[in-house]
Amino acid sequence: MVKKIGVLTSGGDAPGMNAAIRGVVRAALSEGLEVYGIEDGYLGLYHNRMKQLDRYSVSDMINRGGTFLGSARFPEFRDPEIRKIALQNMKERGIDGLVVIGGDGSYAGADLLTKEGGIHCVGLPGTIDNDVAGTDYTIGFFTALETVVEAIDRLRDTSSSHQRISIVEVMGRFCGDLTLAAAIAGGCEFIAIPEVEFKREDLVKEIKAGIAKGKKHAIVAITEKLDNIDELAKYIEKETDRETRGTVLGHIQRGGAPVAYDRILASRMGAYAVDLLVNKISPPLNFSSGGFCVGIQNEKMVHELISVCIAPENKKSKFKEDWYDTAKKLF
């Protein structure tokens, strides 16, 4: 069983990361473990920026957005020599367990630390994109969803006033979950996501059909990277003769106090990660095959090998086809 653990946040920040850190710290302390917070993700691990945490270090953190430990992208961590230094920094402090909060790239780093250095690593899915395999939802997804829906509601007010078509670009990388959920909750008329082939002409055809039925304004929700929003807006305006404007929500989607569900999810996952590290889950985990990651499926905490969850065939979360069918029926 581990005696000292580290916790870090890596990659893009997500609301609820602080709640997850809090869950890890307080659960670990209740098991008699020492906990070290690692600043700025793997970058801080490499530069040996660590500090011991107690229960008061995470007081008043459950409601705070962002991550008080800081986060950074550190592609140099792919270099084995860089990882050797990071491992040595942990071993000098006696750290034998590590909780990594982030996306699949962060998971990959954790898995390497386990395989190369014997550190017992557990990953928690922290990303607004909801694109991590092995879990129904990721920490931060529902808070980002509230942010996007609020923006859609505001855009609908002005779009209806001016009989305008509004395009909303939503984060998600190669996963359309956030766009899809926001489109349903925001009552969007049209949607474009990576999981379904997107063609401008098909979208315009749908918009024209809506106009023919008497539709005077519309909201189009589209996942980032599918198209250039400004160019798409000009194309739609030219083809439909309706004023069209694009709005890129950007990094505002990552900020804000986490909603209640994200706080609960993060707390449960943090505590479950500690349970895995202290062998409270039966049967005890065998870290000789690599690190593990935590997920929630049907509202129950689950775990799986990181290598399974980041495998190409499992890398993306399962497309919510039933959600998409519902959205199409309601357009």
Curated annotation (Swiss-Prot):
MF GO annotations: 6-phosphofructokinase activity; AMP binding; ATP binding; fructose-6-phosphate binding; identical protein binding; metal ion binding; monosaccharide binding
Keyword Metal-binding assigned: yes
Binding sites annotated in the UniProt record for ATP: G12, R73, F74, G103, D104, G105, S106
Domain of life: Bacteria
Gene3D superfamilies reported for this sequence: 3.40.50.450, Phosphofructokinase domain
Record keywords: Allosteric enzyme, ATP-binding, Cytoplasm, Glycolysis, Kinase, Magnesium, Metal-binding, Nucleotide-binding, Transferase
Activity regulation statement: Allosterically activated by ADP and other diphosphonucleosides, and allosterically inhibited by phosphoenolpyruvate.
EC primary class: transferase
InterPro entries in the cross-refs: ATP_PFK, ATP_PFK_prok-type, PFKA_ATP_prok, Phosphofructokinase_CS, Phosphofructokinase_dom, PKF_sf
Gene Ontology CC, one term: 6-phosphofructokinase complex
Binding site for Mg(2+): D104
Active site per UniProt: D129
Requisite cofactors: Mg(2+)
Ligand binding (ADP): 22-26, 55-60, 156, 187-189, 213, 215-217
Binding site for substrate: T127, I128, D129, R164, M171, G172, R173, E224, R245, H251, I252, Q253, R254
Chemical reaction(s) catalysed: beta-D-fructose 6-phosphate + ATP = beta-D-fructose 1,6-bisphosphate + ADP + H(+)
Known EC number: 2.7.1.11
Cellular localization per UniProt: Cytoplasm
A single BP term in Gene Ontology: fructose 1,6-bisphosphate metabolic process
Pathway assigned in UniProt: Carbohydrate degradation; glycolysis; D-glyceraldehyde 3-phosphate and glycerone phosphate from D-glucose: step 3/4
Signal peptide per UniProt: none
SUBUNIT field: Homotetramer.
Family the entry assigns: Belongs to the phosphofructokinase type A (PFKA) family. ATP-dependent PFK group I subfamily. Prokaryotic clade 'B1' sub-subfamily.
HAMAP family: Phosphofructokinase_I_B1 (MF_00339)
Function: Catalyzes the phosphorylation of D-fructose 6-phosphate to fructose 1,6-bisphosphate by ATP, the first committing step of glycolysis.
Name of the featured protein: ATP-dependent 6-phosphofructokinase
Organism (species): Yersinia enterocolitica serotype O:8 / biotype 1B (strain NCTC 13174 / 8081)
Gene name linked to the record: pfkA
